[in-house]
A protein has these predicted regions:
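Short glycine/serine/threonine/alanine-rich loop segments
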Residues: 31, 86-87
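Histidine-centered active-site loop/cap adjacent to the catalytic His
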Residues: 15, 81, 87-88, 103-126
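A mature extracytoplasmic/lumenal domain signature
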Residues: 37, 93-94, 113
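Serine-dependent acyl-ester chemistry module
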Residues: 1-79, 97-100
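Active-site-adjacent bridging/hinge elements
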Residues: 89-97
């Protein structure tokens, strides 16, 4: 996993650069921007619907924990850039419960998940 995370840390620099470009374009065009972090079903916790340990679940070649750690690198970049640039962000990764009723796979949302996200979004939008 260490080598994978090292590669992702390199990619994170390009990701940050892209986020900053988006912010610059929006500011230049007077567009209100809100970033959202990406939730993932897997990671720490037990799925309340299935009883599945979301850390140990094997998805492709990585465990739930490994997938969660990889995505967290990118979510942390969003959080950091939003603080530094004073851009609003809604931390869906922290606000959306880890419950399979909200997902139809590891990161794509079910209809119920989309409804929940819209609720979280409007509760937190400034």
């Amino acid at each position: 996993m260490g080598k994978i995370l090292d590669k992702d840390k390199i990619a994170q620099k390009e990701y940050k650069k892209s986020i900053l470009e988006i912010i610059d374009i929006c500011k230049a065009n007077n567009v209100k921007l809100v970033f959202l972090t990406q939730p993932l079903l897997f990671g720490e916790g037990i799925d309340p619907r299935t009883g599945l340990d979301l850390v140990k679940y094997q998805f492709h070649i990585f465990s739930g924990l490994q997938n969660s750690q990889k995505l967290e690198l990118y979510n942390q970049t969003v959080r950091q850039v939003c603080v530094e640039s004073q851009t609003q962000r809604i931390d869906l990764a922290k606000l959306l419960p880890k419950d399979s009723k909200y997902f139809f796979d590891d990161m794509h949302f079910s209809d119920t998940g989309c409804q929940k996200i819209s609720e979280v979004f409007f509760e937190n939008w400034e």
